Amino acid sequence: MKRVRTEQIQMAVSCYLKRRQYVDSDGPLKQGLRLSQTAEEMAANLTVQSESGCANIVSAAPCQAEPQQYEVQFGRLRNFLTDSDSQHSHEVMPLLYPLFVYLHLNLVQNSPKSTVESFYSRFHGMFLQNASQKDVIEQLQTTQTIQDILSNFKLRAFLDNKYVVRLQEDSYNYLIRYLQSDNNTALCKVLTLHIHLDVQPAKRTDYQLYASGSSSRSENNGLEPPDMPSPILQNEAALEVLQESIKRVKDGPPSLTTICFYAFYNTEQLLNTAEISPDSKLLAAGFDNSCIKLWSLRSKKLKSEPHQVDVSRIHLACDILEEEDDEDDNAGTEMKILRGHCGPVYSTRFLADSSGLLSCSEDMSIRYWDLGSFTNTVLYQGHAYPVWDLDISPYSLYFASGSHDRTARLWSFDRTYPLRIYAGHLADVDCVKFHPNSNYLATGSTDKTVRLWSAQQGNSVRLFTGHRGPVLSLAFSPNGKYLASAGEDQRLKLWDLASGTLYKELRGHTDNITSLTFSPDSGLIASASMDNSVRVWDIRNTYCSAPADGSSSELVGVYTGQMSNVLSVQFMACNLLLVTGITQENQEH
């Protein structure tokens, strides 16, 4: 009853202060409104309080000590342990070896060579008597750079894993008292970041058994089970074999990619483009007769959601309305036709969540299609000539277009006019592609160049030259390091974005390259060509000599079939390669 009365008073005061227009009047009161707590919350708070505090941490923050202090603090700890006759000192002595190794590695990374040599020459002798430690100590002598550490398996294992040291609870408290007695920031940093102290609780006396209330003498006769030795946490031999196996798999040739081919048969109108949605549920194709066709790739049929206005069914007052059978519409269809353009459709792009579709056409317009109602909801205009290509930025914030008017343009979905115009090419902009971070836009042109633009500033930051024909396709690696370009010169060029230079040139196709895509791990790139083939390249390493047909040695697979034209290739997240193309049935005469 008293609690309810207190809450009523607080609410009354809060209402009064609000009426008087005091700013944030209920802020202090809200802090005291919680007067009850569940049993689970109380138990969690007690656990946090018991497990936190100075007794359970070595250092609250890894402070940075001067390199000269490494030698001073380590020498002080060594002298403290060797000069003491306490049993705790003998138990803490094994901690000196990992401390020495980690301090030496830190000095190699952050200090001059003279400081490293002074630290090593002063303390390394105390560890040479132990055969297991001697090997690592001798390897430290030849370690001078971070590259030396990374190339050494045992030293790299120290950085990749925490060294485990077991201490009794009394010895652990003994060590903590020493660390708190003086300036030992370098030691605290190593203990916090690189060493795991496995503290073994001290055995309780008979008096502690009774006082704790957690057990009784009748149950265990005052005896605790003996400590069972736990298995070795770090088996160097097994760890070395495992990491060597991982390295062989990573550096070895990749496994062949699984391909799923979607073929178009007997297209009455010329098929210009085809694309599969990111969720692999829809296939969109643009035709010369200005229509876009959508197919469902799943067993579920395409069904239109109800929309407010249907312009194809506007009734006048004089019309005689008859009941229509909408059973077919409710059941859905396997294909939908989107009409709205008045010229050939050259490119289509799905949004990242597959909720919408963008298309561009010879009619100089870009249209947005709602894939819920399968209707055209937005018309974007700004180009003065046909629009050849589209691309949507990651997370579907912006989209870009390339046109016959020699410009690329940046758009947002909520505005029907372009936000940026990228001018600089001397001929048509045939393809556009966003960088994975959305800050850059790449464009390929008929003028045989590739340009990289700052999406926000609108200026050109890279110019890549070397193609001998129009550039028809672009692709960024998912890690953002490389840009691939290809076109009518039948060569695939890989550019290093950081240096702005050519990284690799891949040869093998015998006709125009029309589509490029990177694998999710940026290790493979697939290319589609009008020579009716799909080729997969491993851009990381070269494993064998060049094939007999003159292709580059990076080629790992060639896929051909009954195709007259391959339209696009798309890598999915599961490393599945989706291919779309046109297949004509053989006719016997």
Swiss-Prot record:
Keywords: Nucleus, Repeat, Transcription, Transcription regulation, WD repeat. Pfam families: TFIID_NTD2, WD40. The keyword Transcription regulation applies. The PCAF complex is composed of a number of TBP-associated factors (TAFS), such as TAF5, TAF5L, TAF6, TAF6L, TAF9, TAF10 and TAF12, PCAF, and also PCAF-associated factors (PAFs), such as TADA2L/ADA2, TADA3L/ADA3 and SPT3. Component of the STAGA transcription coactivator-HAT complex, at least composed of SUPT3H, GCN5L2, TAF5L, TAF6L, SUPT7L, TADA3L, TAD1L, TAF10, TAF12, TRRAP and TAF9. InterPro entries: G-protein_beta_WD-40_rep, TFIID_NTD2, TFIID_NTD2_sf, WD40/YVTN_repeat-like_dom_sf, WD40_repeat_CS, WD40_repeat_dom_sf, WD40_rpt. It is found in: Nucleus. WD repeats lie at residues 266-305, 340-379, 382-421, 424-463, 466-505, 508-547. It comes from the Eukaryota. It comes from Homo sapiens. The keyword Repeat applies. Gene3D superfamilies: TFIID subunit TAF5, NTD2 domain, YVTN repeat-like/Quinoprotein amine dehydrogenase. Residues 211-221 have a biased composition (Polar residues). GO terms for biological process: positive regulation of DNA-templated transcription; regulation of DNA repair; regulation of DNA-templated transcription; regulation of RNA splicing; regulation of somatic stem cell population maintenance; regulation of transcription by RNA polymerase II; transcription by RNA polymerase II. This is TAF5-like RNA polymerase II p300/CBP-associated factor-associated factor 65 kDa subunit 5L. Functions as a component of the PCAF complex. The PCAF complex is capable of efficiently acetylating histones in a nucleosomal context. The PCAF complex could be considered as the human version of the yeast SAGA complex. With TAF6L, acts as an epigenetic regulator essential for somatic reprogramming. Regulates target genes through H3K9ac deposition and MYC recruitment which trigger MYC regulatory network to orchestrate gene expression programs to control embryonic stem cell state.
